Amino acid sequence: MIQLPPHHLPAEPRWFAPGAPGPAALPEHVTATGVGSWWADRALDPRAVAVSCAGHVLLSGDPGSVAPGLLAPFAHSHVEAPVRFLPVLGSAFDRVVPDERMVYIHREPVEPPRPPRGVTVRRLTPTDAPALAALSADSSWIYDSWGGPEGLAASEHGWAAVDRDGRVAAVACGYFTGQAYEDVAVLTTPERRRERLALACVTALCADITARAHGELVLRTREPPEPPAGLDGGLPA
């Protein structure tokens, strides 16, 4: 598929239903943040479109208009698409691996765990960008959907457990943010695991999301993406 320039984007509601949970919030997130890309089978009057961000892809439209070779940019990605796209996905890649995720429906308040001495759980601010950038390379995925550590730090959609020296021990954030739902990512550094820091960050983030959404909260916790050689996709992605 061809990547569309910012001034020639398709009308989002026509292709993707707004207000859906999980990665379905991706189009709203890309539109609002400018992080990610829109794709189409052709620039004028597209018959199929895709939106991608941080290794995740949503497909919509007529799969018959998509030659397998047009999907090459989405190799090694997590793909969510209607079932009708499975034949062309199977033709485009050596391996298509279905991926299922647990969806948590948050309805009851949860008492936040008390962090250990010397650790503060708080909202990220722009001054936290260097601490996020200092995370290991294996942890860099946590800010990919915001375009980098500076984007996540300034987003007002992230909470972190920070020690006295300003190091980030755990972080939870809205990975894909929509008007009705946010897809949540959470990360704890290896040396600070089993201290309930991730739970403390997620609890604070969920309270923040609920205060903004004023309604039911549906969350997906996500692990670092590890797609196989080929395409990692299926329903759901």
From Swiss-Prot:
SUPFAM superfamilies given in the database record: Acyl-CoA N-acyltransferases (Nat)
N-acetyltransferase domain boundaries: 119-237
This protein's record includes keyword Transferase: yes
Entry keywords, A to Z: Acyltransferase, Transferase
Enzyme superclass (EC): transferase
GO terms, molecular function: acyltransferase activity, transferring groups other than amino-acyl groups
This protein's name: Uncharacterized N-acetyltransferase in mutA 5'region
EC number per UniProt: 2.3.1.-
Signal peptide: none
